[in-house]
């Protein structure tokens, strides 16, 4: 058993919270501590109703394992293109190669803002598509600096922030979490090593993939073949 989550970055964007903000860190603690408390209560309630299994005798629990955060790449596409698991969105627009063809996927939260400004135009989406899905090159009269901060993509976010949020989350996860990191091909080995050491020092149990490719150059479909059994 391992209850997980999906759509973390999409949730933050819906709330208008940049991934690397203090408020996002606070939400990490509040939400995952709340999930842990409710999961434990649910397991205790099940133990009262159905009894404790032999391997849980004396614990008051029905389950030995409770939480595990899977990648959920496939599921996130199925439900409409929200962010996968706890991972930031890799791009604000990208091509998706699926079984039924190739599709263009857009960040719905970004699209809402562009629609509200009357700027949901191919011109801006085409620009982002040629810039690896980044919104940072849009004119400031189209997206303010604050809005650009909100729509930073996975490769554009400081990877130490992912690690620090994951460390907070890990306190409430009895198993582990699918934590990917993204680095530019020109990032120094020293920086990459620093991020990995920080993850170890903060008590993160595992790291999953280290990304160095662009979702635009490789399309999202190619990422979905990583691990069929755990992808979700």
Task: Describe each region flagged by the PLM.
Residues 1-4, 37, 102-107:
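Short acidic alpha-helix initiation/capping motifs at coil-to-helix transition points
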Residues 7-10, 14, 30, 34, ...:
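Alpha-helical scaffold segments in soluble metabolic enzymes
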Residues 3, 12-72, 145-148:
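Internal maturation/activation junctions in enzymes
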Residues 67-232:
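Catalytic alpha/beta core of large soluble enzyme barrels
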Residues 1-7, 12-30, 153, 170-188:
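Conserved alpha/beta enzyme-core scaffolds, especially Rossmann-like or related mixed alpha/beta domains
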